[in-house]
Regions:
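Intrinsically disordered, low-complexity segments enriched in small/polar residues
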Residues: 12, 41, 46, 52, ...
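Short regulatory "switch" loops immediately downstream of catalytic or recognition motifs
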Residues: 18-24, 48-51, 74-75, 103-108, ...
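Intrinsic-disorder/low-complexity regions
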Residues: 9-12, 36, 46, 62, ...
């Protein structure tokens, strides 16, 4: 018996086979390359877009295996979207196999691929393994789709760019592409007869449950699937909020920042404040805060800081009131992880919501002025100016930095009331209603991450609180007695302003957060010398609505009054 001859071709090490009018392996016709098996390995290229003149339409008749190989439909000018390569056989891809092509996608677009055109890979047999589809834009940059399509409140897809007639599993072909806006484009698929077709989408589909619902429910019109965001977008949108939380944590409340300074009126039988030359203080602080957005974006921040200050002027009046005026320097850092509830992989919403992280550093200068009345009432005024530096790191490896500044103004008042009668040198309880209003302004410099322009602009925050502090002041006997303080605190905080949307390319993206939350805490101050104290404060906060805000923070400090 006569054996049928076979032709098996192995290409490797970057070798390129250009399909053109004379490229037929067995010269069957001018557009067909005929073989039994073709293996592409180690960067070898099957080039189906050799010419810029007219549409390239070739047939590779046989089975193709791509082991880190490349099927190329990207023509030399990168500006033609009508090339077609048909593999008339079966196909497998492995080890980072690629398909490179040109795709154009303009607005407005629709679910069926209107306003899009593309090169196409058509496989008549089966397909297996995994192959990455990479769109090449007009400048030759990979993973960017040409055109001006942008996120809108409707489903947006392209025409199919890979068509498989035979059996193949979803995810055989995958890919992601950038836009110059907030959206990311992902390759997804749908059944088409006995096979499957792959297309680019801007919308994330939910995972379809495998088990049927029992009892069955009547069908309803599905909501519009959410837009797929680029992994950098949550950080770009939420970083101004993270910067503000760092500013608020640095300023804090009077008792977190300074402990109990009424001891100037109590210690040494009320004579401590009369000859005080100044007070030097320092503290370290830490905070963990988890915030969910009302729409889709969440973040978790860990804040650390150190603060050193000095009151260069302490003034005491004849009526027993005293005033402290001083400055402080602070360094703070915030490490923030960002999340997207609709993060998608291959066009399907993923269980892994993490999108990237950000690091914020701040250097702050503060000016303080605190006034205590003879009855213990106080007014605390603070102005704080901060230099900010942010560094963004998305899970895709995009690494970019920016600078900015922040300014904070705070006014806090309180009035203590004795809960039991006691002499000035006796222990006693008191209750102190408090209120505070903080205005913060953050301005971040715009930047370009290499794909899109990001402008967060200026953001303003107005945060207020009302609360109460219950304190026990224990005073030792003797001429030089010191005052040890223990207290509990409860507050209601409220944000009066919502963050503004951020411009990302031609898109604007915003997020809103919990506006009201409760806080409880404990604090202590102990004398460690005739004129020195250590103090500490720890607090827990939780939202009072349906949107999550959950966190805890603490500080420990030391202060010394100079005589």
């Amino acid at each position: 018996a006569t054996k049928t001859p076979s032709l098996n071709i192995n290409l490797n090490n970057g070798f390129t086979w250009n399909l053109n009018s004379n490229a037929s392996a067995q010269n069957a016709d001018t557009t067909t390359a005929l073989f039994d098996n073709l293996t592409l390995s180690s960067g070898a290229v099957l080039n189906g877009a050799f010419s810029d003149a007219g549409a390239n339409n070739y047939i590779a008749k046989g089975n193709v295996a791509s082991d880190a190989g490349i099927i190329n439909l990207d023509n030399p000018s990168h500006a033609k979207y009508d090339d077609v390569l048909t593999i008339d056989g079966n196909y497998t891809g492995s080890n980072g196999a690629q398909v490179r092509m040109n795709t154009l996608w303009n607005a407005p677009g629709d679910e069926n691929g209107a306003d899009s055109t593309s090169d196409v890979l058509h496989i008549t047999g089966t397909a297996g393994g995994n192959t990455i589809v990479s769109p090449i834009n007009t400048s030759g940059t990979a993973n960017i789709i040409d055109g001006n399509v942008q996120q809108v409140a409707s489903v947006l897809n392209t025409i199919p760019v890979v068509i498989v007639d035979g059996d193949n599993a979803a995810g055989t072909f995958t890919g992601t592409a950038q836009t110059t806006g907030a959206a990311e484009v992902q390759l997804t698929s749908r059944g088409a007869g006995a096979g499957r077709e792959y297309y680019w989408t801007m919308n994330a589909k939910p995972i379809i449950p495998v088990d049927p619902v029992d009892p069955p429910v009547d069908p309803v019109d599905p909501p519009i699937p959410p837009v797929i965001y680029n992994p950098s977008v949550p950080a770009y949108v939420e970083m101004p909020r993270a910067n503000m939380e760092l500013g608020y944590a640095t300023l804090a409340t009077l008792h977190e920042r300074r402990g109990e300074n009424q001891t100037l009126a109590w210690d040494e039988c009320g004579t401590c404040g009369t000859d005080a030359k100044g007070q030097t203080w320092g503290r370290i602080l830490g905070k963990h805060l988890e915030q969910d957005g009302k729409t889709r974006l969440n973040m978790t921040s860990n804040i650390y800081g150190i603060q050193i200050g000095h009151d260069f002027k302490i003034k005491r009046t004849d009526k027993g009131a005293h005033q402290l005026t001083g400055v402080y320097l602070s360094y703070g850092r915030s490490n923030t992880n960002f999340y997207d509830n609709y993060r998608a992989v291959n066009g399907i919403i993923s269980d892994d919501k993490y999108t990237g992280k950000g690091i914020s550093d701040s250097a702050s200068l503060g000016l303080t002025h605190t006034r205590y009345a003879p009855n213990g009432s106080y007014l605390d005024l603070v102005a704080q100016l901060s230099y900010l530096h942010n560094k963004y790191q998305s899970r895709r490896g995009v690494d970019v930095g920016q600078n900015g500044f922040g300014a904070v103004l705070s006014a806090e008042v309180g009035r203590p009331y004795a809960l039991n009668k006691h002499a000035s040198n006796e222990s006693g309880w008191m209750i102190e209603p408090q209120a505070q209003l903080i205005y913060q302004y953050v301005d971040l410099k715009g930047f370009n991450d290499g794909i899109r322009q990001v402008d967060q602009g200026s953001q303003s925050g107005l945060r207020g609180r009302v609360g109460v502090r219950v304190a026990h002041n224990a005073q030792s006997s003797g001429d030089d007695y010191q005052t040890n303080t223990f207290y509990g605190v409860a507050n209601i905080w409220h944000d009066f302003l919502n963050p503004k949307a951020v411009s990302i390319g031609q898109d604007r993206v915003g997020e809103k957060y919990a506006t009201t939350w409760a806080e409880i805490g404990l604090g202590v101050q102990r004398a460690v010398g005739k004129h020195s104290y250590v103090y500490a404060d720890a607090r827990y906060e939780h939202d009072l609505g349906k949107t999550k805000r959950d966190g805890y923070r603490g500080t420990i400090g030391i202060k010394h009054t100079w005589k």
